Amino acid sequence: GISAEVTSRAEKGFYRVKYELQDKPLVSVIIPTKDHIEDLDKCLQSLEKVNTYDNMEYIIVENNSEKEETFEYYDRIQKEIPKAKVVYWKEQGFNYPSINNMGVDNSKGEYLLFLNNDTEIVNPDCISELLSQCQRSEVGAVGARLYYEDGTIQHAGVIIGMGGVAGHAFVGFEHDDLGYFARIVLVQDYSAVTAACMMVKRNVFEEVGRFDEGYAVAFNDVDLCLKIREAGYLIVYDPYAELNHYESKSRGYEDTEEKVARFNSEVDRFQKRWKDVLQKGDPFYSPNLTLDKN
C-alpha cells in the first residue's frame, strides 16, 4: 500500500526506495540572515532556478544586519520574488533557535525547511526528495547531504557522542566516496541531522516544543532531533537531496573568549539533558567504532 519505486544502485547489493509525493503541500523555507547578501541571493536563486518544487514560501529572518545595501536588497528581492517575505528579529546578539522560531511564527506551511543562508541547492529535485521522505507518517525530520565549496563532504548525518557531544559523519570525505558500509550514499535513519538544511513536519515541530532557545548557537538542531525521536518519530538522512554549504560565513567562528564560554555552557546543557542517550550510545553508530573523530 506504499506508493514508491525501488531501484538498484550501481554498487551491487544496494537499493533506493523513491517515495511518490502524496500531494504538494506548502513548504515554508526559513532562512536566517545577517548581511552577506551575495550568499543569500545565491541561496534564493538556487531555490528559484534550480529547485523544481514550486509550492513554497521563503521567510527571510533578518537579524541585526548593518549594511544599507542589505536592506536595499530586501526591498528589491521581495518585489522580484513574490513568495519571499522578510521579517525582522530585533533582539540583540545571536540566538539561532529564537530566530528560527520567529520565522515559523511568520510562516504558513505544513512543512518547515530550515535552511542556512550560505547554502545552495545542487540537484533540481532536492526539495521534492526531502518532502517525499518527510511525508512518511513515521518520519519527523529529514536532512540532506551537504558539500563544502571544494566538493568534499560537510554533512552526511550526525553521530551522538562524537567529540563528547555530537559531530557530523564523514566530514572531509571525497565527493563520490561511498563511506563506511556505503552510509554516505544510502537513505537511512540517524539520531540527528543538521539544521543547515532540515525539513520538519510543522505539527511535529510544535509537538516537541520547537527549538530550545537555551542553545543560542550550538547543538540546537541535535537537541530538536533527539526530542523528535523521543516523541516516537524517525530522523532520516537523504543523500539524494544535495546542497553546497559555505559554512559559517555570516556568523563567524568560535574564536573569542566569550564565544568559547558560551559554547562550553551549551555543551554542559546538552550533556545534562541527554545524559542517558550519551551513556547508552548512538543506536545508529557501532560501539566498536571511535567517537574521537569521524
List the model feature ranges, each with a label:
Residues W89-S107:
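Glycine-rich, basic loop-to-helix element that forms the pyrophosphate-binding segment
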Residues T119-V165:
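Conserved donor NDP-sugar-binding/catalytic core segment of glycosyltransferases
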Residues E48-Q92:
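Acidic donor-binding segment of Leloir-type glycosyltransferases
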